C-alpha cells in the first residue's frame, strides 16, 4: 500500500505549539535590517519610483543572456549518456530583458534573505509533493553548511549542549564550538542513531551540574555522514516522539536524501500522479513529513544532486523560525546565490525539466551511483575483505562506505584492564599507524577519530598542531577520547563516487597495504 501524506490531511494539525523559548539570546536581540524593511514595503507599492536603493542599475550589468546547455531527458538513461559524452542536449536560457522564469534583472540585484519567490515557490511545490508539511515556509540558503551554522546561532546560547550522533560530520559540529555550544553524543549502531540512548541521556540529565538540558538535535538521517547509515522509519517515529516528550528542535540535515538505491518506481503512480509523487512514495519518510508541532527544521541542498560549487539549498521551517532565519541572513550573507537561483528557476520551470523531469534526472543519478557502489563493494570483497581484516556494510543511500578494521586479529592488538575494571586498548595508535601507512602508499581514507564526538568539547582556548591520531576538537586543542568511544574508532570513511579507475586502483592499494599491516 502506498501512503501519501496530503496537504489536506496535514492541515488538520497546524503548528500551535509555542516554540519561541528555543530562540537564542542573539536571535531575540537581533533587529531587522532597516533598509531591507523599507525595500519590502516599497515592493508592494506598484509604480513607486525607487531613489533610495544602493545597488547598481540593471542597465549597467555586463550581461544580457545566459544559455545553460543541459542533458535532454528524452533518452532512456540521461546520466549515462551525459557521462559518456553522447547525450542529447537542451538549451535553457535566462535573459535580462526578455521573458523567462527569472529575469537576470532580478536574479543579479540585491534581494531578501529568504531568496526569490520564483525559486522558493517551485521548491515549496517540491516539498508539498514529497513531504506535505503543514504551514511551512521555504527559505533559500548558500547550501547546508550556511543554513546549519545559522541555525546554531538561531537556537544556541553559550553553555548550551546540543545532541548529535556519536560519529558525525565534524566540520559542522566544530562550527558551533566558538558559539559556546557543546555536543552530547548519542550512541549509534548500523541502523543509525539509537532512540533509547537519546531518551536515556535526556532522562538522566542533571541541570544543576550539566547546565540546560539539550533542546536541539542535529542529525543526518539519510546516508549519515560518516557512517552511511539510514534511519529506518520506526526509529524516525520514535525519535520524533522523544523530541516531543522533551521539547527538542530537530535539525534535519539531509543533503543525501535524493540519493537512495534500489528504489522501484511504480509506473501506475507515475501515470496517475506524476513522477515526483511516484518517487516520493518509495523515498524514506522525513522528519518533516511527520512533524505535528513545527519543531523540525529541514535542510536540503543541490550540492549532491546538481553541483556543490553552485552553493544553493533550501530550508523548510515553521513560519516563526523562518522569519528569524531570514532576518539573520538579511544582516549577514544578504541573500542566496543569484546565478544559482537563475539556473534553478529555469531548470525547474516550465521551459526546463520541470519538477517531474528533475526527479527523473535524480533517479537516473541514483542508478549511476548505485552502479559505482556495487562496483566498490565487489572490488572491496575481492581486494580488501578476502582475509577478514576489514568489513563493510552495503550503504542504502548517499556516497559513503563505513569500513571496519578488525584490529582484534592484529598481532600487536592489546587489551589491558584499568584500575576501575574497564578495558583499554591500543586501537587509536594502531589506526593512526594504518592511516599513515595508507597515506604513504598513495591512498587517503578519513579515520573515524576525525568524526568522533567526545561529549566534552569546549570553546577554543588556544591553537596547537592538529594530530589525526586522536579526536580533534576542531579548534586546535587536542581532546582525550572517552573510553567508550576510544575503543570504537577502528573505522575509515571511504567514498564510492569516483571513477571506476579510482575505485579499483584505490581498493587495490588498500588491500595490499592492510595485508602488509596485519602481517607485520
Curated annotation (Swiss-Prot):
Q: What is the lineage of its organism?
A: Eukaryota, Fungi, Dikarya, Basidiomycota, Agaricomycotina
What's this protein's family per the entry?
A: Belongs to the class-I pyridoxal-phosphate-dependent aminotransferase family.
Protein name, please?
L-tyrosine:2-oxoglutarate aminotransferase amt1
Reactions the enzyme catalyzes: L-tyrosine + 2-oxoglutarate = 3-(4-hydroxyphenyl)pyruvate + L-glutamate
Q: One Pfam family from the UniProt entry?
A: Aminotran_1_2
Q: Which PANTHER family match?
A: AMINOTRANSFERASE, KYNURENINE_ALPHA-AMINOADIPATE AMINOTRANSFERASE, MITOCHONDRIAL
From which organism does this entry originate? Serpula lacrymans var. lacrymans (strain S7.9)
Cofactor(s), by name: pyridoxal 5'-phosphate
List the induction conditions. Answer: Up-regulated upon coincubation of the fungus with the terrestrial bacteria Streptomyces iranensis, Bacillus subtilis or Pseudomonas putida.
* Keyword terms, alphabetized: Aminotransferase, Pyridoxal phosphate, Transferase
- What's a single GO MF annotation on this record? pyridoxal phosphate binding
Top EC class for this record = transferase
Question: InterPro entries under this entry?
Answer: Aminotransferase_I/II_large, Class-I_PLP-dep_aminotransf, PyrdxlP-dep_Trfase, PyrdxlP-dep_Trfase_major
Pathway of action: Secondary metabolite biosynthesis
Q: What pairs make up the disulfide bonds?
A: none
E.C. numbers: 2.6.1.5
Gene encoding it?
A: amt1
Biological function:
An L-tyrosine:2-oxoglutarate aminotransferase (probably amt1) and atromentin synthetase nps3 catalyze consecutive steps to turn over L-tyrosine into atromentin, which represents the generic precursor molecule for the entire terphenylquinone and pulvinic acid family of pigments, which are widely distributed secondary metabolites in homobasidiomycetes. The first step catalyzed by amt1 converts L-tyrosine in to 4-hydroxyphenylpyruvate (4-HPP).
Q: Which GO terms describe its biological process?
A: alpha-amino acid metabolic process; biosynthetic process
